[in-house]
Amino acid sequence: MKQQHTLTYFISSLVILVFCVSVNAQNDSIPKTVKDTLIIKEKYGLRIGADLGKLARSFFDDEYSGFEIAADYRLKKRIYIAGEIGFDEKTTVTDYLDITSTGSYIKGGIDYNMYQNWLDMDNMVYTGFRIGASTFSQNLNSFTIYNTNQYWARQFTSNDLQEFKGLTAIWVELIIGMKVELFNNLFLGLNVQLKLMASETEPDNFGNVFIPGFNKTFDSSGIGVGYGYTLSYRIPLYKKNK
């Protein structure tokens, strides 16, 4: 009787041991959860484009022609070196003045991307600054001297062309905008600029009405505004882990 009890205990223990080994083997055969090893890489490169707004305005506005080339280079994850170079010709006509402003400009600065992209998205919502410089000329086509007492004398009007060359201007501007990747490496952008004049040379007897790159001046306040619609293509140079 005692031997039968001992045999039963031995068999039971053996069954339990085999069961435990079997369970352990099954657990070992189940693959463990693998940590996500997907590595997303971000593109770094040179982005070059044109201002579509200036091209469209040149087509529709008879008193304006101009173009602008814009570029940026991704320096760090959120920091871009950026700049623009362009040309403007604008004729301003008022009741007392007809003047054509012509010249070129260059701007350079930094953009900071505030937008956190998902996965491999590559869009921008950014803010930045520029330092701009322009060299230009003003052609005074005609002008009228306003006379408050027209009873005794008529207003004086001159149609003699006067040219003022070698004028310069330097300014700073704040910029905010966005760039959306339409297709692989092709971007559509929109931005607005607030400009503050640092220094300028003016023609004799009147102020600058329009400065290339700075745009219209407002009552000699030294404040200007601008906007841009850009289409650009990025030349990818290398990638970094996100």
Model-derived features: positions:
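Outer-membrane beta-barrel transmembrane domain signature
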Residues: R130-G226, T230-K242
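Gram-negative (and chloroplast) outer-membrane scaffold detector with strong preference
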Residues: I79, E84-A153, L231-I235
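Bacterial N-terminal signal peptides that target proteins for export
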Residues: K2-I11
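Residues that define the transmembrane beta-barrel architecture of outer-membrane proteins
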Residues: Y44, E63-F67, T102-I106, N123, ...
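Short loop/turn motifs that connect adjacent beta-strands in outer-membrane beta-barrel proteins
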Residues: V34-Y44, R78, Q116-M124, L182-L188, ...
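Extracellular loop and loop/strand-boundary signature of outer-membrane beta-barrel proteins
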Residues: K35, K54-R57, T92-D98, S158-F164, ...
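Short glycine/proline- and aromatic-enriched beta-strand/turn motifs that initiate or cap beta-hairpins
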Residues: A25-R74, S232-K242
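Bacterial N-terminal signal peptides
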Residues: I11-C20
